[in-house]
Amino acid sequence: MKKGVVKEYDSSKGFGFITGDNKEDYFVHVSGLREHLKQRGLRAGQTVSFDVEIGMRGDKAINVKIG
């Protein structure tokens, strides 16, 4: 798992971006959050752990959890 910080997240739209420890930005969609976070969403500045899914539009954060 990678570590990073939530750069921005719009709960009303269900997506945002995480900046990884490697300074790369990863798109995150509500579908990539662990179940307990789907209702709550994410907040800018939160430290998170995540896996990366390589997609046609770029890398995407999945299995996102706090910590």
Describe each model-derived feature in a short phrase:
Residues E53-G67:
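OB-fold/S1-family single-stranded nucleic acid-binding modules
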Residues M1-S12:
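Structural detector for short beta-strands of small beta-barrel domains
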Residues D10, D21, I54-M56:
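A generic beta-sheet turn/junction motif
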Residues D25-K38:
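Beta-strand/loop nucleic-acid-binding surfaces
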Residues K13-I18:
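Short aromatic-glycine-enriched beta-strand elements
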Residues H36-S49:
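Short nucleic-acid-contacting surface segments enriched for D/E, G, S/T with interspersed K/R
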Residues K3, S49-D51:
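Beta-strand secondary-structure signal
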